[in-house]
Each structure stands twice: as C-alpha cells, then as structure tokens.
C-alpha cells in the first residue's frame, strides 16, 4: 500500500474496475427486493454545476447503501434534451441545436462518470432521440382518441418583429427579449391535454404519498385548487346593449349583496363586443394584451380598467350593475368574469378606490361592527348585514341560503371549481417533439398512422429567431394525407418539453424495447422508490408526471397509481456574491475564487480585493450559484484538484440534504484532509499489524477497548439509520469522524487492540463507501486482500457490544456541567447519588450548601439542585 493518498490514481482504479465488471448493470430479479432510485435528469446545458453534483451524489449514496442492504438497485441516467436554451445557443453559435445538444451530452456524461456514480449507463436515454419521442407521439394519439387531448384556441405572447411566440420568461418588462418590441397577446389554435379530468384523483391521491414533503403536497393541492362555491348568473341588461348573461363563480356567495360592479377579462366576448363601437375600449384591450399573463404578476401590477357602458342585473336585488374591463381578471380562470365586492376583496377594493366605485359592506365581525368608510377590505368570514332576508347569518348558512334562493330563480347553483387548467402543450418552436397530426383540405385534421411514427424532427436546421424553422421547411411540412392521398401539411408546432419529462422514469425500465412504449419490466421496477430533485419542480413536472402515469394506467400500460413513492427535495447550493458598480451604475460580478479577503489582526473580515488588479470589490452576501452572478464553482476543477470523493464528502457533510448548502473552500479542504487521515490511519495500521487473520477475541477486552468497541457498534447503528431512514448524511459522517478521533487516541498496541483497530477500520470503510466509494474500494482491498468491497453487505451492529458493563454519567449542579463519574451499568440509584455527591470536582460547588434534591436521568446524568 502506498503511503500517500493520491485521489486521481485511486479513482481511476476504482472506476476502471466498476466499468470492466459492469458492476451497476441492473437486471430484473423477481426473487429480490428492488430499489429504484432516480435523481431528476439534467438539461444538457454544457457543463455540470454544483447543484447537479449535490443531486446525483444524494441519489448515489442511497443507491449504494441499498445495494449493500441486499436490494436489486436501479439507478439510471438520461437527458432532458429538448428545449428553448438549445435554440438560443444555436442562434448565438450558428450551429443546429442537435449538434449543440449532443456535444453537451457527451461532455456532461464524462463529468458525471468522473463522480463515480453507480449508474446503469446501458439504460441511458435522451428525449431528443426519435426512438424516445416516438412514444410521446403515440400516446398523444391515444389521448386524442379518448378525448384526453383536444384542440382549441389559446392566448400566447407574440413578438411582432420576429413574428414568433415567446415563452413567459422571454418577456421582460412587456418586451421581447431579443427585439425589445412590445409583446402582444395573440389567440391561436393549440392542443391541450385534459389534466382537469384527473383533478379529483390528483388531489385525493396526495394523501397516499406520506413519503413526500408536506410542503410539496400542499403546493400541489393549492395548484389544483379545489374550492366549493356558487355559480351565479347575472342577467344581461338588454337596454344597455349587453349581449349576454354573465356567469361568475364565487366562494363568497355570502357577500353577494355587496356587489357593486362586475369585471371581465380583456379577452372576454363582452369586452370584445363593447370595443367594436368604442375606440378607447379597443385601445385599452390592446394595452391589456401587452400586459402580464401570469397570476403572480397580476397580483402585483397596477389595477387598471375601463367602463364598458354595459350593465347586468343583480340576481337577487334587481339592481343594475356596471360591467368593467379590468386587467386583474384572467380569461383562463373561471368564466373570465368576477363579481366585484370591494368591501370584502382586496383587489376589488383597490380597483374601486382607484375609479371611485361604490364600496358596500355586508359582512361584519362576529363580535363587533365595521368602521365605515372602510380603510381596507374586510376579508374574513363574519356575519351578514344589509343583505335582506339573509342578514344575521354566519358564513356557511348564508352561502347555503343564498345558493337555494339563486337556484329557485334559475340564476345559480352550488358548484365545485378547480384552479387547475388543462395543459396547453403546443409550442411554436423547432427544438421539440413534433405533434403527429396532418391537415388536409378534404379530410380535416388527420392523425399520423402508428406505422408512420415517429414523425422525425429534422436535426440540421439553425433557428434565426424569426418564427418557427419547421414552418419554413417544406421538406418537413409537405406530405400526403394518410386517408385520401392528396397533398397535405404537417403540424409544425412541437410539444411542451414537460411532456418529455412526464414519463422518462418509466422508459428507463425498458429503453431497449423498440416495438412498444413499455413492457413487463415496468411492472418490476416501477414505481420509483426514491425520487430526488429541486423544490422548483414541486408543481409542474411532478404534477404532469402524476397525470401522465395515471393516463398510462387507464390505457392498461402500467399497473401503478403514483409514479414516485418517496420524494427528497434537495436545497440549493449557495456561494458569496462579489461585485463592483461601474460609473454608469452597471453591476459587474466577479467569481469569489478570484477575490482575496482582507482581515484584521483578530481575523475579522475588513474588505475584499480582486486579485487581478488589487482593487476593492463589494460583498453582496450569499446567493444561489448562478451564471448571472458569476459565483459558481466548476465541479471539474474541484474533481481535478481534490478528487471526486472530496467533492462528494463535502456535499454530503456541509448541510442536511433538504437545506441550502453554503459553499466554503475551507470545508472542501477539510473534507480532503479527512480522507488523507483515513488513508494514513489504514496505512499506519497495516504497517504495524499487517492484515488480520481472524476475528478479535472480544471476551478479554479491557475497559478502554470495550468502550471503543461500544462506540464502534453504536456508530454502525447510527450511520445505518441516518443513511437509510433519516437521510441525514451529515450526521452519519460526523459520527464516523468522532469514531476516527477516538481510534486516533488509542495507544494500546496489544493484539486485542490491533484486532479491534482492524474491525473498526473495516467497518469505517463499509460505512463510508456509499459516500466516498473510490477510496473505500481501494482501502478494502488493502484491509481484506482477495475480496471486493462491492460484494460486502452493510455492517450490522453487534448487540453484545452495545451492552455496557460501565457507563459514564454527567453530573450537573443546578443544570450546569460540573463533573463526570463512571459506574457499573447496574448500579443502584442511591449509590449513583452518593458517588455524584462525593465526586471531588462536584464537591467544590456544593460544599457548605444545602442540597434540595437530586434528579437522575438513568444512564445519562445526575443533576444536584442546591
């Protein structure tokens, strides 16, 4: 065994062995318990970042641990390869997105493999490959047949200069990110998936996911947004020219008598009707079309509106209510209209105040009145007043009674409403999965026959930013109608990339199956036992995946109900932010690795300078690692300098997995020192003792060795629980570090001590092997020549070693530590109390004082109260 720890040599040796032996190839074995561990697959952006390293190390630790527990483990990897960034990069570099994507995949694959991940690379997939997205297309056609996919118009962001649709993130302050043109809202035909058909099941099944964080389940429940309320119909006031009745859904029917106006979205048919004869309204509608589309944005933007001059009739009082167009009403939610109760809704209050509309209070607190005029909306449940025959009722009785009255008049009824909307999957983009439909003048919309799938995306196009390249490529869109044979045109929209990621975890079970979407192997591996990914995917990706798997279940393709049994959402990786402000006020960011910190004599930070020019830079606190802030750390450089095991160890030790991790160079260096110490401890032991020939004789151990062996087996039990149940990798590592510190203090060189050292080091290598597998692979070969670490089971704590003859008790005086005593484990309490009172260190604090009582926590401490 060489004396020094050289991570590059060691990691090369281990990885070569794993590759040559196909160590992590997963094969179905019905007689074995399976464990399917999956970290969310990455977008091939070009290089790994530290968030990737953390994500995939967590999954690898769990995979390796369960392998040692006897499970048949599957840990695959693939690439979420379609998407807008590839198109942007293609425009910048004048290369097809396909080349950019495949080059990135090749580079990132090498990076991942350098981390020593126990993955079955034979199951690798990329969503941009035709043999993958063929099945997107196939299932989409099945959904069309079942009515779970359909075509209707939808509103999109439109850049009038580039003549292209923009994603929400491409709209910056109302303007296109590339051209700076004011973005318009256009209504175009789009395809939707009917996720609302599964709304109830998606909501109720959250209760069957105890292995998911409560926060994620709550976020999904809120997104689905099931609410119970009343659908109210406000009859049209024909004299005002109102063309139709207005339907409104409300969860606060108790406030119906406080309605002072009705507001509609700019896209509502009533708004369009009113604008035909009113240029000012038409201009306002156009302004709204250039505004925000997202609910979160609407909540913060200034409330604006225009009176249409149209009226509806209050369904119970008969009062005429003005109809306004308001920019805070979304067409995509409810009926695109709201009944406005300014006294009891914050948005309505703000709007009514802005436009001097009436504010009529009809709800008051249970135990007090309301001060009128209101300074703000009173939004709590309370007691109705000024509500005719419904005055004096609490919330639910008022809602029930008003719903009955509306139903009797044919102007309303109780309804269940969902915030969830159907999933619009059409994207007017090139780099995505083609939608398998053909438009024929004679036959209409014609599905591509199954035998003609996949509709292959051409991979040699280079986007220029002006529209969808597919719509300008006749070789793609020109085709013959499958029904009549006449000339026809392919659909040039592509699918939302969330479609690709909604079922990839299923395809891993059978990536070599080319004749069907799935096969029987799916029934063995699925559902995923442990899924790992960022909290930012809590809603869309996870919800769409749950929906997609339920559709596949109902089509008879899979047996499971929920795709992910357990979910771990790892925290972000943070680093310092360093910057300067230029004379023009622009902020220039610098990587913290290029900055020298200045400290005073006490080591306190007093400043920072850029190493390149020696000039000061400002510290902007701690923030998520990102390209925009230039505060990332290159994993490749870290691995090259310290080795993959150091990177893995730091990532697992620096923070519990669900919490944010603050980057610290000192922490990385500390992890490296620990591995060097582990290597040296094994080296020194083998130099002194050689390889052990057999188990140590435990019967004759003295007190010191017994205590050390107790700590060893206590550590084995703790680490197993920390890794397998609690997933607190940092505390598992800390326990091993404490054990190593204790071993380092051992001066005994007797055969028993050397035997105990061998037992301890073997178990330490086993315990650490899921976290730092390379060094452990090599150390095991040194400790146990002729055997391989991968063949070893997880160590089990020796119950006999955990039975203590002697225990150490803490002695407190008034709750403060004042001494320690060692006693036999079966010592009677009265003797323990006497020994505590007689302890020399303790006596200094109690001499001359009256002892009021002695409190004992068996096996732990004695507290003397004076």
Curated annotation (Swiss-Prot):
Q: Gene3D superfamilies given for it?
A: 2.20.28.290, 3.10.20.590, HUPs, Isoleucyl-tRNA Synthetase, Domain 1, Valyl/Leucyl/Isoleucyl-tRNA synthetase, editing domain
Q: Which compartment or compartments is the protein found in?
A: Cytoplasm
GO BP annotations of the record are: leucyl-tRNA aminoacylation
Q: Which GO terms describe its molecular function?
A: aminoacyl-tRNA deacylase activity; ATP binding; leucine-tRNA ligase activity
Cite the EC number. Answer: 6.1.1.4
Q: Which UniProt keywords apply?
A: Aminoacyl-tRNA synthetase, ATP-binding, Cytoplasm, Ligase, Nucleotide-binding, Protein biosynthesis
Q: Which InterPro entries match?
A: aa-tRNA-synth_I_CS, aa-tRNA-synth_Ia, Leu-tRNA-ligase, Leu_tRNA-synth_edit, M/V/L/I-tRNA-synth_anticd-bd, Methionyl/Leucyl_tRNA_Synth, Rossmann-like_a/b/a_fold, tRNAsynth_Ia_anticodon-bd
What the entry lists under CDD domains is as follows: Anticodon_Ia_Leu_BEm, LeuRS_core
Q: Which reaction does it catalyse?
A: tRNA(Leu) + L-leucine + ATP = L-leucyl-tRNA(Leu) + AMP + diphosphate
What's a GO cellular component annotated to this UniProt protein? cytosol
Task: Specify whether Nuclease is a keyword of the entry.
Answer: no
Chief localisation class: cytoplasm
* Motif placement: 'HIGH' region: 42-52
Q: Name one Pfam family in it.
A: tRNA-synt_1g
Ranges in coiled-coil conformation: none
Q: Which family does it belong to?
A: Belongs to the class-I aminoacyl-tRNA synthetase family.
HAMAP family assigned to the protein according to its UniProt record, in alphabetical order:
Leu_tRNA_synth_B
Q: Which NCBIfam families match?
A: leuS_bact
Q: What is this protein called?
A: Leucine--tRNA ligase
The organism encoding this protein is: Nitrosospira multiformis (strain ATCC 25196 / NCIMB 11849 / C 71)
Task: From the UniProt record, report the name of the gene that encodes this protein.
Answer: leuS
